[in-house]
Amino acid sequence: MQNLHNELRANSHLKHFGRLQYTLFLKGTGLSLEECLIFWRKSFKLITDDKFNKEYRYNIRHNYGDVGGDANRRGRGYSPYSCQKLITEPLPGPGQSHGCPYRTFATDNLIALLQRTGVADREVLSDIREDVKKHKYHIACNRVFEYTHKKEIKKVKEEGSWSAADLDTIVHPNTYFKRSWMLKHLGEGNAGIVGGGPDKMEE
């Protein structure tokens, strides 16, 4: 999702499948429809309100189940995409940025991206290369998560405050976000406020 966010910030735009993936992710974090509409309107700062309302607003509302057929409204729209869905979807075409970067990026570009985000350990980067080569994308992603949260993970393990299930392999972008948020806010007393639990996610 960080890749989609960076693309959005750089270009003030995402193509359809990138918008769909990111909108559903934001929905899974607990962002309301109104908040999501504001987010996209502010992000698409190079277009007019009229163009945004005509070309983009309806799709966002549809993703949330606010419009569309009865089944869509009853089901409250679409569920956030799981890792499995993202790595089995067709690869993005030119100008598109959706999907799982562990699968869609050339390995050297992926490593460069990870280095820019603070993954500096050569052994970790080497292991990620091997994981990607073997198409073990979720393992590579979890390796990055463990590296970037190693202090917090060590703390909850030592304290016994998290069960083994709480640290299971991550197989959903919203789980990645939620677990990261909770680890980074340990001891703040409100670490459970992030929405989008596993029951709300697409397997």
Tell me the role of every PLM-derived stretch:
Residues M1-L20, L24, G28-E203:
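Basic, alpha-helical nucleic-acid-binding regions used in initiation and control of genome expression
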